[in-house]
Regions:
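Juxtamembrane linker/hinge segments adjacent to transmembrane helices in membrane proteins
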Residues: 1-24
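Short, glycine-rich, amphipathic interfacial segments at transmembrane boundaries or analogous
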Residues: 2, 47-49, 191-196
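Membrane-embedded segments
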Residues: 33-148
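Soluble catalytic domains of enzymes that build or remodel membrane lipids, polysaccharides, and related
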Residues: 97-216
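Conserved small/polar residues in nucleotide/adenosyl-binding loops
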Residues: 220-222
């Protein structure tokens, strides 16, 4: 499926996201194994299971993507859920740790409620544990046979922990499609300091600038 997916640096986040969704939809149709012959038959798209791994580290508060990286990501996920049919969705949130925000479900109303409640305060430990998120997502699918499975990682890729590439390869070996959506700009942006009109600063008083780590994300894209 990698050849169907856009490079993480080529397109705006919303364009990339819908290319990801279209590719997953095509994968589901291929799983249905349509037979071609003299009789025209309608092939119903087989449902897929999609685990969203969403970065909620403080850098996702940067506003180089409006209204912020995190809010943009949440809006795109909500739009994806609205388009689902016969599919299941679950959500992993991660920063320095990763945990399940929503077990995989076909209850789209609940999915959007859980999505709305996501914010950086859910995880106090900072970092970008992409590998842990992918590993957790890989274990979160149902045991049902004959269904497509995909993980969509949404992150800026900054300050990532080790093991992300290895986790993506391990998931791919299980037949799980691993897709990465980079949110942010390579030029970077400061991180708003919550409750103030200022930005987060380092120990020397310098404004912290967070940048999209395109190079690392391209390695995870399996």
């Amino acid at each position: 499926m990698a050849q169907l997916m856009p490079d993480v640096s080529k397109y705006r986040p919303d364009v990339k996201f819908w290319m990801v969704f279209a590719a997953i939809g095509l994968f589901a149709v291929l799983l249905a194994r349509p037979q071609f012959g003299s009789k025209l038959e309608t092939v119903k798209r087989q449902g897929v299971e999609v685990m969203i791994a969403l970065d909620i580290s403080n850098s996702m508060l940067a506003q180089d993507v409006q209204p912020s990286r995190l809010q943009k990501a949440k809006r795109l996920v909500a739009q994806l859920v609205d388009k689902m049919e016969n599919d299941k969705v679950g959500m992993i949130v991660f920063a320095g740790d990763a945990f399940t925000q929503l077990p995989i479900t076909s209850d789209y109303i609940s999915a959007k409620m859980f999505l709305e409640s996501i914010d950086p305060s859910l995880i106090s430990k900072q970092g970008t544990a992409i590998g842990a998120a992918i590993n957790l997502a890989s274990r979160s699918f149902t045991p049902q046979e004959g269904v497509g499975r995909a993980i969509i990682v949404i992150t800026d890729g900054e300050n990532h922990e080790g093991g992300a590439v290895e986790a993506a390869k391990a998931a791919a070996e299980k037949g799980i499609q691993v897709n990465v959506l980079g949110v942010g700009m390579p030029e970077g942006a400061p991180i708003p300091a919550e409750g103030t009109n200022d930005y987060r600063r380092d120990r020397d008083g310098n404004v912290i600038v967070t940048r999209l780590n395109e190079q690392m994300l391209s390695l995870i894209h399996i």
